Design a protein with these regions (language model features):
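NAD(P)-dependent Rossmann-like dehydrogenase/reductase catalytic/cofactor-binding core
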Residues: 264-316
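N-terminal Rossmann-like NAD(P) cofactor-binding subdomain of oxidoreductases
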Residues: 1-171, 268-270, 304, 313-316
Length: 316
C-alpha cells in the first residue's frame, strides 16, 4: 500500500484523480491541499500528484521531492525544455533544475523511462491524442500536421453552459500545447482548438498530414491499410490505444470514449493526405487516468491497476 497526496484536490483534474483512486486498493490518499485548507502531512506520502496550475506546480514540486515523494505533475510545467516552456507558456520557470530529471509521462511510449523516474510530467489532453496518432507514422508522412480539435468544457476547467456555444480561442502555433505536440510527435503542428461550452467531456482531434511519395503512389485504400498497420504495430498489445473503422451500423464518436481510459483512432486517405480522427476523454486518458497509469508504472504495477474499476477500459 502506498500513501498518496494531491495538491489541487478540488479542481476538475484533482476530483478526477480522487474518483479513480477510490478504486485503487494499493493506494490511500492521506494528504490533500488546495487554496483553502490542507489535510494530512506531505512527509508521510510516497507519491504526490500536482493537479495545479503551472506556477503552483513549479513551487510545490521541489517541496514534494525534498520530502522524499515521487511526483506526477498534471500541469505543463515539467513537460518541455526550459526555453520551450517559457516561450510557449509566457512564464519564467522557477524550478528549471528539475527539468533534466522529469520524464514525459506517456506510458504507451515511455514506460521504461517512467518506471525508474522520480518525477513525471503528465501529458496534456490535446497532445495525448495528437502525439499517439502521429508518432508511429514517421517516414510515412511528411510536412506539417494540421490539427483541428474540439474539447468538452471541462478541458477549459469550466462548467457546462446550457445553450450551445462553440469557442475557438487560438490559431496556428500560438497554443501552449503546440511545442509539446511537435517535440514528442516529431512533426511540426498547426493547431486550432475549439471548446464546446455545452458539452462536459471528450476530445475529437482531426489531423491532416501529407503522405510520403511512396504512399502517394499506392491506391488510397492500400495506403490507408499501411498506415493503420503502422499504428497498430506501434502499440502492439496495448489495450488502451486502438485503431478502429466505421461501419454501416456504427460511426465512432466521443460518446464511445467518454468515461473510458481509451484513445481510439480512425483514418482515411484522400488526394495525397491522411486524415486521422482521434477520440479520447480529456479528463480521463487526457489527464487523470493517465496520471494514475504513470503512478502504476512508477510502482512496477500493471498500467491498468485500479483504473479499470473507475472507467470502462474497453470499447465495443
Amino acid at each position: 500500500m502506498i500513501r498518496v497526496g494531491i495538491y489541487g484536490d478540488t479542481g476538475m483534474v484533482g476530483q478526477e484523480l480522487l474518483k479513480v483512486l477510490v478504486h485503487h486498493d494499493q493506494a490511500e490518499v492521506i494528504f490533500k491541499q488546495n487554496s483553502k485548507r490542507q489535510e494530512g502531512e506531505l512527509a508521510n506520502c510516497d507519491v504526490v500528484f500536482l493537479a495545479t496550475k503551472d506556477p503552483e506546480s513549479m513551487k510545490f514540486a521541489p517541496e514534494a521531492l525534498a520530502a522524499g515523494c515521487k511526483v506526477i505533475d498534471m500541469s505543463g510545467a515539467f513537460r518541455l525544455p526550459c526555453d520551450q516552456f517559457e516561450a510557449g507558456y509566457g512564464l519564467t520557470h522557477t524550478a528549471p533544475e528539475l527539468l533534466k530529471e522529469s520524464v514525459y509521462g506517456m506510458p504507451a511510449l515511455f514506460a521504461n523511462e517512467i518506471a525508474s523516474a522520480r518525477m513525471v510530467g503528465n501529458p496534456g489532453c490535446y497532445p495525448t491524442s495528437v502525439i499517439l496518432s502521429l508518432r508511429p507514422l514517421k517516414g510515412m508522412v511528411v510536412g506539417e500536421a494540421t490539427v483541428v480539435a474540439t474539447s468538452g468544457n471541462s478541458g477549459a476547467r469550466a462548467e457546462v453552459e446550457e445553450t450551445s456555444n462553440e469557442v475557438t480561442y487560438s490559431f496556428g502555433k500560438k497554443h501552449k500545447h503546440v511545442p509539446e505536440m511537435a517535440l514528442y510527435s516529431g512533426f511540426a503542428v498547426n493547431f486550432t482548438p475549439i471548446v464546446l461550452r455545452s458539452v462536459f467531456a471528450g476530445i475529437n482531434a482531426n489531423i491532416r498530414i501529407e503522405l510520403s511519395d511512396e504512399l502517394k503512389a499506392l491506391p488510397p485504400h492500400e495506403a490507408a491499410g499501411k498506415l493503420r498497420a503502422a499504428i497498430s504495430s506501434a502499440y502492439g498489445a496495448d489495450d488502451l490505444v486502438k485503431v478502429v473503422e466505421d461501419s454501416a451500423d456504427h460511426i465512432w464518436g466521443t460518446r464511445d470514449v467518454v468515461d473510458t481510459h481509451m484513445l481510439v483512432m480512425k483514418l482515411g486517405v484522400d488526394d495525397g493526405f491522411v486524415y486521422i480522427n482521434a477520440l479520447e476523454d480529456n479528463l480521463g486518458k487526457g489527464a487523470a487516468s493517465q496520471g494514475i497509469e504513470n503512478m502504476n508504472v512508477m510502482q512496477g504495477w500493471s498500467r491498468l491497476y485500479g483504473i479499470d474499476g473507475a472507467y470502462k477500459t474497453g470499447v465495443e
